[in-house]
Amino acid sequence: MTIVEVVVLSASSGMLRYRTVSDALPAGVHPDDLALHLSGLTLCTPGATLHSTSWRFASESVVLTYAALPDPSPSATVPLSPDRMVTGHAALAPSPPSVDTDAVAAHAARHLALLAVTDPVIAAAASTRPDLWDLLTKLPTGVAGALR
């Protein structure tokens, strides 16, 4: 089974916050379409951004993770822990034994921080939402793993 998970980002009191939503991918549906539906974003949302950031194997399913912003319903959010990262234990065993939601959200946010300075489409969207992107672009732009 494939699960589509969306980390929906918002800002409050100068802090990045997030919530996650997910659902099983129905047959014949593109993951991007389900992620857009789950995010609640529309083509009319100023600065709307949806980007695939990672995948992992969990509970007999492949989980495709997307980052989305701005959150159209920023209730029940939690603070983003941008330094929360997990890594595999060996070069030939890249998957960490477990990946918690905070690590997934941190990875997604750092991925967007990198795209803000490398992808002109994302940079254009970012220019319309400085309240969120100013916070995102302060994050380290490493997207996978970290040297400790």
Report the location of each language-model feature.
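Nudix hydrolase/Nudix homology domain
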Residues: 16-23, 27, 56-67, 73-148
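Conserved Nudix-box catalytic region and its N-terminal flanking loop in Nudix hydrolases
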Residues: 1-44, 51, 57, 85-95
